Regions:
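Anionic-ligand binding region
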Residues: 102-114, 118-121
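Conserved N-terminal beta1-alpha1 strand-loop-helix module at the mouth
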Residues: 1-89, 93-97, 104-110
Length: 121
């Protein structure tokens, strides 16, 4: 039987203590760390960018499951890959060419994810 993987989000973490929060998740059995990236444009909220993700790498070797809620997403994929994302999830609505963006993620040796909005036509 396949093992279920746990990927808790750091969105509700204390952003002034992210290193400690990630250590707590790791000690609690997390398999991955889910990072919600929001730009205040594609979605109304604003969170973190590549420099923060890069700075968190020193606290864990767990997979960073980075969910990009930004537009235009294609422009920033490499920045997040270089910062330490292992899995990059994007929204079709945030890119002009979904296949091209997914191919870019794969070319950077990262796993890909697509987040679907049921209301999108």
């Amino acid at each position: 039987m396949k093992k279920i993987k746990i990927s808790p989000s750091i969105l509700s973490a204390d952003f002034s203590q992210l290193g400690k929060e990630i250590k707590r998740l790791e000690e609690g059995g997390a398999d991955m760390i889910h990072v919600d990236v929001m730009d205040g444009h594609f979605v109304p909220n604003l969170t973190i960018g590549p420099p923060v993700i890069k700075s968190l790498r020193k606290y864990t070797s767990l997979i960073f499951d980075v969910h990009l809620m930004i537009s235009p997403v294609h422009k920033y994929i490499k920045d997040f890959a270089d910062a330490g994302a292992n899995l990059i999830t994007i929204h079709p609505e945030a890119t002009e060419n979904l296949k091209e963006s997914l191919d870019l993620i794969k070319s950077l040796n990262k796993k890909v994810g697509v987040s679907l909005n049921p209301k999108t036509e």
